[in-house]
């Protein structure tokens, strides 16, 4: 079992042996730990010789940066490159981040389907950038991503991120502890490993902005903001969740929910009250806010519970279109 620990004792260079405990650079199947007591962040030679790691863990209390701030032609080279295609039976295959620096840019170069991705916390970002930013190559496999707390950008600035399932937040516990909270941005370059639409987004708390197509959104709590003219194949909205059809209408780009299953919660078209489409809906209970009456409803809109269990606000003197 090879556990390799970053110290950053002399600089932020990943290829300097003096920056690793006992001078041991990572090797294939190693478990890399970035501890709270590291002297420097990981900020140079970010495309270090690629080895297939089994895990990469940025521990709580690490306050330094990973990667550097850059844009334009230098953007892609500002990320730390990490391959998580290794296997090691002694410890689980895992990416875990709980550092609190104001910038961590990480590029997943390879992965396995068994590698879990967990964001337990982040710092607060600077200069308008989320604290943790993740992108990837076109991957053959990828584990699910769980985000509990912090600021996370998936596929920033339109970059690629291959992942099938994203889980954000956690509900209140039975002991009365409050739910976790995260702020997540899902970019237009996020898609499934097979290059189809993102398969599932499950949200229990926090706020998530979505700029890509999604097969299924399960919204149990927190807020989901659709910020582009994308398509959601199925939206399952439960008590405690708020779904905002927030994108402004643009030519040839009208946000569409192909099937709404309203079990509770609130669907709203208030932030940018422009034309959007709900092709089909099963309405059990909940609230729909469309004060400018800009939603177009398909003819497969069905009350599954009592009509009085669904609260509508279409504004005064409106004509509602069911096509």
Regions picked out by a protein language model, each given a short descriptive name:
Residues 1-285, 290-299, 303-306, 311-323:
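Extracellular beta-sheet-rich ligand-binding/adhesion modules
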